[in-house]
Amino acid sequence: MGLTTKPLSLKVNAALFDVDGTIIISQPAIAAFWRDFGKDKPYFDAEHVIQVSHGWRTFDAIAKFAPDFANEEYVNKLEAEIPVKYGEKSIEVPGAVKLCNALNALPKEKWAVATSGTRDMAQKWFEHLGIRRPKYFITANDVKQGKPHPEPYLKGRNGLGYPINEQDPSKSKVVVFEDAPAGIAAGKAAGCKIIGIATTFDLDFLKEKGCDIIVKNHESIRVGGYNAETDEVEFIFDDYLYAKDDLLKW
């Protein structure tokens, strides 16, 4: 995957972030969880679940592949244990902590989280990385329909005060940082531009799913600052793998 060298500046009203695979590389931990979950369930194909369920709520995966265990309280308990039992298998997506800290340092709340993980698990991942959680921290416990439904990202953008504005889209420009097909579909359905993080899937796959910018990780992204007059935060992409031509006109 070749990187470009000409920086790209993107000015937006708000940014929404997935967590697993976007802020933290938790897939090895979650894979270990699924393998342990399936040890006493002969009908449960852990490798298949690992392959197809990235970006889903754990409850939705269990409801589909082990419906007898689809109890919300039970699933919440299972997920809360993942960072504790398997946390040593997880690391930050390179540059994620620095980027999140830069967003937290802005004078106005300009970012939110919308994850398919439960509240307990997502909070523990943030504690694991030492990142202060944003005010709007949307988890599996806060939505009726998980990704690929747009509800998580709609809640994030609406909470920050930037609902879809069909009359004047320039006043409600929101980007989603995502790595997974379900989240990309959710973000697009929520009227957002998609910044694809190539941690889980490759460049061609992310292009096929409709990402507007694709980066290897967060190391090449900087927060340029906040303009109170335009109510925009600037993201500067020093390197990127791909960008749609029309993005520069957004």
UniProtKB/Swiss-Prot annotation:
SUPFAM superfamilies: HAD-like. It is an enzyme of class 3 (hydrolase). The active site is at D18 (nucleophile), D20 (proton donor). One of its GO terms (cellular component) is cytoplasm. Signal peptide: none annotated. Optimum pH is 6.5. Keywords: Cytoplasm, Hydrolase, Isopeptide bond, Magnesium, Metal-binding, Nucleus, Phosphoprotein, Stress response, Ubl conjugation. The modification Phosphoserine is found at S90. There is a cross-link at K64, K144 (Glycyl lysine isopeptide (Lys-Gly) (interchain with G-Cter in ubiquitin)). GO terms for biological process: carbohydrate metabolic process; glycerol biosynthetic process; response to osmotic stress. Transmembrane segments: none annotated. One of its GO terms (molecular function) is glycerol-3-phosphatase activity. It is found in: Cytoplasm; Nucleus. Its cofactor is Mg(2+). It catalyses: sn-glycerol 1-phosphate + H2O = glycerol + phosphate; sn-glycerol 3-phosphate + H2O = glycerol + phosphate. Its main location: cytoplasm. Mg(2+) binds at D18, D20, D179. Monomer. Belongs to the HAD-like hydrolase superfamily. DOG/GPP family. Present with 5000 molecules/cell in log phase SD medium. Glycerol-1-phosphate phosphohydrolase involved in glycerol biosynthesis. Plays a role in osmoadaptation. This is Glycerol-1-phosphate phosphohydrolase 2.
